[in-house]
Design a protein with these regions (language model features):
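A short beta-strand-loop-beta hairpin characteristic of the jelly-roll/cupin
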Residues: 132-151
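Short, surface-exposed beta-strand-loop junctions and turns on beta-sheet-rich folds
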Residues: 121, 147-149, 173
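Short, surface-exposed charged micro-motifs
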Residues: 103, 130, 165
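Short secondary-structure subsegments characteristic of cysteine-rich extracellular domains
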Residues: 149-160
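Fe(II)/2-oxoglutarate oxygenase catalytic core
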Residues: 1-103, 107-115, 121-123, 138
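A short hydrophobic beta-strand segment most commonly corresponding to one strand
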Residues: 127-132, 155-157, 171-185
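Short beta-strand His + acidic residue motifs that chelate non-heme Fe in jelly-roll/DSBH
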Residues: 115-116, 139-141, 158-170, 178
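Short glycine/proline-enriched turns and hinge-like loops at secondary-structure junctions
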Residues: 124-125, 143-144, 169-171
């Protein structure tokens, strides 16, 4: 569902173009075993803490206080302050109560995000929003039985509890900022 348009995304796109190394800093989604994101490059702005624990005791201690919905700022969020202004605008528009994951995903021409459904605990807690930073006709976004083209500067909500996928049949990179926001619904 289209929830906003005419968002000025140019300052963020220029900032990203000045820092191409940010696409290579975190390959977690792309490298996830059997994951749907092998054609995706991501800039992680906010995401849950990804820790490695050397002992069972350390892991158990971490899990005793773990909040699966908590996301933390990653270094690129400070490097791209232009993203923060768009995120805060979106939060105000939708009555956001808590900010979760925020990432910028790029799908090359001919690339895709394979069909998948996000985890129920996540989809029941957060609403998923896309802010379109770059796109072109030929990008097909499907959620359930609905296919949409999302234009530059638009903000969309979609039901990520439904099977969804993206196919980039355009000649340009498809770049979206994805924001998970807890709303009062």
């Amino acid at each position: 569902m289209l929830i906003g348009h005419s968002i000025d995304v140019m300052p963020l796109m220029l900032a990203i173009k000045r820092r191409p190394n940010l696409w290579k800093e975190d390959t977690y989604l792309r490298d996830y075993p059997q994951g749907p994101f092998k054609d995706v490059e991501s800039i992680m702005l906010r995401f849950p803490f990804k820790g490695v624990y050397e002992t069972e005791a350390e892991l158990k201690n971490h899990l005793s206080t773990y909040d699966q919905h908590e996301s933390i700022d990653y270094p690129p969020y400070a490097k791209l302050p232009e993203a923060r202004s768009i995120v805060m605008f979106l939060m105000a528009q939708v009555g956001g109560e808590r900010l979760g994951r925020v990432m910028i995903n790029k799908i090359r021409p001919g690339g895709r995000i394979y069909p998948h459904v996000d985890t129920p605990s996540h989809t029941e807690y957060y609403s998923r929003f896309h802010v379109v930073l770059q796109s072109a006709p030929g990008v097909d976004f499907r959620a359930g039985d609905e296919h949409v083209y999302m234009g530059v500067g638009e903000a969309w909500w979609f039901n990520n509890a439904k099977e969804h996928e993206v196919i980039n049949n355009s000649g340009v990179d498809r770049i979206h900022m994805i924001c998970d926001v807890k709303t009062s619904k």
